[in-house]
């Protein structure tokens, strides 16, 4: 069995409840944010090195699939930031409170706060996407 399959089956097979899902979401959102930053730095460098490629990148970013990716990116940034603050708080200020019950409770709080911040932002972004790309809502 390949190491990737072994790793993925280990990640998905382990049933650590909230702590496990918190770890996985933190890892995935960090990778998503890092991927975006890498692509963003690369395409911004096109302004200097290849201006025509930069204009092509802008056209791609105006597409529907890129707009949906941006909605996902906003979730990644918000969750990764809030969960990182949660982890930093327990590591630096309240290490004695780092226990399974508090892990469960704070995971749900950080996920709920993420959704409370993300849903309005995603709604506005999707509204603008539908308006600008498909002419809906008087666009």
Task: Identify the function of each model-found stretch.
Residues 1-139:
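Membrane-embedded alpha-helical bundles that constitute the cytochrome b-like, heme-associated redox core
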